[in-house]
Each structure stands twice: as structure tokens, then as C-alpha cells.
Amino acid sequence: MKANELREKSVEELNTELLGLLREQFNLRMQAASGQLQQTHLVKQVRHNIARVKTLLTEKAGA
């Protein structure tokens, strides 16, 4: 997911995206804890995507 794609979205869409990413992060953490996660790099990718969305939400709130 690119920041440019996210910048085009509205605040409601970003909040929906954030909720989906948080759910995905939870599921990945549960898989990692139970030893079922094969692609551990996905945890980092999701964490960075969450940070991107939160940054854009903060920018839009200030503007």
C-alpha cells in the first residue's frame, strides 16, 4: 500500500482501512504466538501500514 493511494482516501475510508489493518495485525500476532505463522515479515509490513494510515489521519485532522 502506497502513501499516495492513501492520501486520495477520505477520513472515513482511512478509519475503515485502519480497523482492517488492526484486525490483520491481531490475527498475525495470534498465528505467530501459536507457531503457525510462516511469513513473519507480514507483521512488520502491517505495522508500517498502520503507521502510514495513522500519520495521514493526523495530517487530515490538522488541516
Curated annotation (Swiss-Prot):
Gene3D superfamilies: 1.10.287.310. The keyword Ribonucleoprotein applies. InterPro entries: Ribosomal_protein_uL29 (IPR050063), Ribosomal_uL29 (IPR001854), Ribosomal_uL29_CS (IPR018254), Ribosomal_uL29_sf (IPR036049). GO terms for cellular component: cytosolic large ribosomal subunit. GO terms for molecular function: structural constituent of ribosome. Pfam families: Ribosomal_L29 (PF00831). GO terms for biological process: translation. Keywords: Ribonucleoprotein, Ribosomal protein. The keyword Amino-acid biosynthesis does not apply. Belongs to the universal ribosomal protein uL29 family. This is Large ribosomal subunit protein uL29. It comes from Pectobacterium carotovorum subsp. carotovorum (strain PC1).
